[in-house]
Amino acid sequence: MEIKYLLTVFLVLLIGSDYCQAFLFSLIPHAIGGLISAFKGRRKRDLDGQIDRSRNFRKRDAELEELLSKLPIY
């Protein structure tokens, strides 16, 4: 009976330590890296690139619509 409880506690501690290790070694360094890149202004440059890509996409979409409107309907 005692071994059953001991095994349960051991498994709970093992799972808990695994989650803590994943939190400490993946989430925190990524958060620190994100803050550093935000202070350096890389994030702003990334957003500018996304805006340009969005404009290009809209331009290509409009050109495609124009091309499709000129095609005959069968």
Swiss-Prot record:
The modification Lysine amide is found at residue 40. One of its GO terms (cellular component) is other organism cell membrane. Residues 46-74 form a propeptide. Its main location: secreted. It comes from the Eukaryota. Belongs to the non-disulfide-bridged peptide (NDBP) superfamily. Short antimicrobial peptide (group 4) family. Keywords: Amidation, Antibiotic, Antimicrobial, Cleavage on pair of basic residues, Cytolysis, Hemolysis, Membrane, Secreted, Signal, Target cell membrane, Target membrane, Transmembrane. GO terms for biological process: defense response to bacterium; killing of cells of another organism. Residues 1-22 form the signal peptide. Has antibacterial activity against the Gram-positive bacteria S.aureus (MIC=20 uM), the Gram-negative bacteria E.coli (MIC=150 uM), and the yeast C.albicans (MIC=64 uM). Causes hemolysis on horse erythrocytes. This is Antimicrobial peptide 1. It is found in: Secreted; Target cell membrane. Expressed by the venom gland.
